[in-house]
Amino acid sequence: MAALLRLAVLLPLAAPLVATLPTSPVPIAARATPHEPVFFSWDAGAVTSFPIHSSCNATQRRQIEAGLNEAVELARHAKAHILRWGNESEIYRKYFGNRPTMEAVGAYDVIVNGDKANVLFRCDNPDGNCALEGWGGHWRGANATSETVICDRSYTTRRWLVSMCSQGYTVAGSETNTFWASDLMHRLYHVPAVGQGWVDHFADGYDEVIALAKSNGTESTHDSEALQYFALEAYAFDIAAPGVGCAGESHGPDQGHDTGSASAPASTSTSSSSSGSGSGATTTPTDSPSATIDVPSNCHTHEGGQLHCT
């Protein structure tokens, strides 16, 4: 009986405690201020297409854009071939010897995925060099290091990758600038934002590129010519004529070069020049605005006024 009385006394005290307990959870929003979402884009402002100057008309722009797209396609496949086969690839060893693959992969990837803000293609011939015989374009050098001029000759002489391994084309026997893709790859490597002052001319022409690879020097995987030749042969063998390609044979060291006299650039800084040490060759910009220059017997000139001596 006494126990029941004590329970009766305690029940009124416990009832308010039970009544104050919540019957359902309080929404989180009512208990705490939610964090504001953070919007962050690490690549904000990235430029993913090569800029083309307003001096290019509609047809010029379309051709340059298509050529640049093919340059990216050529570089992308070269990179993919290396990533798949490494230096087990016979084509890789042919052009790069036993060099590690990372440098060549990077040289192609910067064309494919690098930011393109500091590259500009134009058509208005600001330095006057398109008037020089045989010029299809040129890097503007110190006049404007990010700019490349495409001259009218390019529109009538460059071919598309779909025609590779036809019309007598071979990798060894034809010029690297046969195609828009490889011509623009070469021009891009002169621009600091792409070549970064590292891709350079250490060998000239097919035979020197092959000799450089056989020497296993350190230059082949950042030699402009080697990078072009490898990309062309890998594309020819894998894509254009699968399993067959069109490697061809060299026509000799002087193929495609003027060994007599050459027109000089209209300004001292428009040649795509640099020095190399890998093959004992030197590359010297022509530095006079005169109409012609004498070329030593051990030298020849590239399109764009570049003097290359061995």
Swiss-Prot record:
It holds the Pfam family HRXXH. The keyword Signal applies. Disulfide bonds: none annotated. Glycans are attached at N57, N87, N143, N216. It comes from the Eukaryota. GO terms for cellular component: cell surface; extracellular region; fungal-type cell wall. Residues 1-16 form the signal peptide. Residues 247-310 are annotated as: Disordered. Keywords: Allergen, Glycoprotein, Secreted, Signal. Residues 258-292 have a biased composition (Low complexity). The keyword Secreted applies. Its main location: secreted. It is found in: Secreted. InterPro entries: HRXXH, MetalloPept_cat_dom_sf, PRA1-like. Residues 300-310 have a biased composition (Basic and acidic residues). GO terms for molecular function: integrin binding; metallopeptidase activity; zinc ion binding. Belongs to the ZPS1 family. This is Major allergen Asp f 2. It comes from Aspergillus fumigatus (strain ATCC MYA-4609 / CBS 101355 / FGSC A1100 / Af293).
